Amino acid sequence: MSPNPCNLNRSNRRNAFWWLLILLGLSLFVGWKFSSSSPFYSDITELLPQTQQQPEVIALEKQLQTQFSHQMLLLIRSTDPSNQSSSNKIKYNNDSSLELAHTLKNKLLTSSYLVDTLDQKNLQSNFQAIYQPYRNQLLTPKLREKLQQQRAEDLAQTAAAKLFNLTSTPRPYAFSEDPFNLGGQWLAAQQSNSKVALRNGWPTIYAARGNWHLINLELNESPFKIEIQNDIIPIIDNFKLQLKKDGRHFELLESGLIFHAAAGAKLAKKEISSVGIGSIAAIIILVLLVFRSAVPLLAVFIALSSGLICALAISLFVFDRIHLLTLAFGSTLLGVAVDYCFHFMLNSQQLGCSQRCRKLLAPALATSALSSIAAYLLQLATPFPGIQQMAVFSAAGLAGTWFAVIALGPFYQPKNSNTIRRCSVFFQNYVQPLYHKFRSHHRLYMGVICGLFLVTALILQHQPSNNDVRTLNTSGDALIETSRKIEQLLQPNSSARFYVVSAASEVQLIERLEKLHVALQPLRERKLISSEQSLAQWSPSLKQQEEDHTLINNKLFQQALPKLCQLLSIKNCSAFKQSAISQLQQGLTPQHLKTLSILDPIRLIKSGQGVHAAMLLKLNPLTTDDDLRSIAATQTGVNFVNRIDNLSNLLVSYRQAVSVYLATALALIAAILFYRYRLCGLRILIPMSLSALIGLAVAAQCCGITVFHLLAVLLVVGISLDTGIFYHEMGLNSESWLAATLSSMTSILAFGLLSMSQVPVLHQFGIVVLAGISSSWIIAPIFFSTKKTC
């Protein structure tokens, strides 16, 4: 008697053993990566490629980004009424505000991730120590003009009056060293553009409804690290909660990339939970309703686990870390993965033998998997790190699911259920006659298909593209509004629009920065720029220092100092003069300022082409890029940079690149289909292409076509490809239709959740897939009959 072909044999057990062994090894690797370090990150900028700009511009942008991204600003004030409040007017307790600021700062500094690099006492002492030798060769533009225009007598009288004026500029150096307080005026001028003043040694912003006290701390590691967010954010949350419990009234404004990163990470985790868990719940319900057994559910679970473990292991091996958006994107592949399971189980039901089913479905499974994997791996040729990561994750997940179905499929013992029989009757009585009747009207059938192609093509032709980088934003409205309020209070320099100045040497660089400062005068007069910050303000050119030293020596120490001594009844003026005036120092250079962390954003960098530095601008909201570019065009070695526009332009180029790769992927799939099925491949290719176009046309109605819409098209193509291949191999029967229906319903539920995402990227992705899969489910059966025809 010959052995029953449906019984398990040694080959089946060996294949299953080796696959489970490989899966165990991959699981151990994933577990090791999870235990040794944090495998996930949420920095959206790491998914973007480097901008195609000059190296020095990229380096300065990175320098600025690092400085601003590691900064954490908090503004706090008490809104408790003061004890001196009258019935008519409320006075706010500023001492209470200062107490809250001290308490919060001390709590935050208990974190090992925060440092107080801008401690006001240390900062002031550093300034005084650095500038002390150069105090007699540094003049602000206003003071220089004053010395040039006023008489020596007037300068002496002004200096004498300020000695006895308690509100005059602080004197960092002794009167014998700096009788005209040149050093004090220089240091005060460097901080004059700031809205922040020192009150009781604390940075304060004066306001009618109570003073704001500033806490400015710096992160010593990336704000995108989850462990840093989990360490710092709870400190602030607990502080606010405790104040509310104590009945304190206060306002706290938070600004810094760490808050936006934490909001993005929280939202991404929420999206992963809603998409992944929603999809899994849909699969469980559908499997139990259709198969009335836990065994198919176990089969689906094993296939999904295999795909997820393979995707995680391969992605962690290739990239070391996985972005949370990649994980959210990958969770949508659950629908594709279970497609293989549904087709295998339902055809096993029909044939009554898993062994025969595997042999029969092997070509279809192989064609579907290889086509989809090839399409995903083609994206590795893009210079888009996010696309590359998603491609590897998706391809590895599909491969893992395919291997699981092939290796473990023979162990599935099919049992028919009443639900499957009812679905079969429903298909034969309603679905099959409906599609047969539609196909019998050949002209109508062809007209509808051609009409859909024409309508979608016209819609897409008239839809504008959307390349705004702000669509990547994951911060909530409240956080954005808080950041805007802080910007209004502090009026900081813009980190998005600035100048890059290049030169052959440091001396030439400072001179060009000074010339640019002069060239910006028309914009200052038009109130388009309120101030700017550059190295030239902190370290003037050597030529300017020499001129200022000569002016100070001649006008102040030769002419005004004797008159000042006379006014103050100082008899030994010559000895005093000798100790006060020093010889011209070698000159203050940017190298002398390297210990001042406050200058990090404008610090110069060196390259093979020379030296480069940024000039930051405090801009009016009405200032246009054309205003700033017109100034740059008149200067040598000056370039204007708009970081947001650069990133948006980057999305333009990569949307175009993804379009090319998408067309190439479709051409590759078409070649595989024609090689495998000849002209019958058109039956698969036409509904697949039409579904992708419909999904893209529907999604483009809301915000134009983005690069993420195009990425979603690949997933629609993958699911439509599976549906078409199985219809072709097995014929349009109740089993193949039910499998396609289950797969589509699972994916639609998952992607329906995704299309309601608050993350613009995921929302755009979900809309395309939702519309595309629905279209594929409706359209694909039109092209196939009950039996394989070619």
Name each model feature, range by range.
Residues 122-294, 535-670:
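Extracytoplasmic
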Residues 446-567:
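Juxtamembrane segments of multi-pass membrane proteins
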Residues 351-382, 730-758, 775-777:
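Pore- and gate-forming transmembrane helices of large, multi-pass membrane proteins
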Residues 2-42, 408-468:
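Signature of alpha-helical transmembrane segments and their immediate interfacial
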Residues 302-417:
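Hydrophobic alpha-helical segments
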Residues 296-341, 681-724, 752:
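Hydrophobic transmembrane alpha-helices and their membrane-interface caps
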Residues 32-80, 193-202, 462-504, 718, ...:
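Solvent-exposed, non-transmembrane loop/terminal regulatory segments of multi-pass membrane proteins
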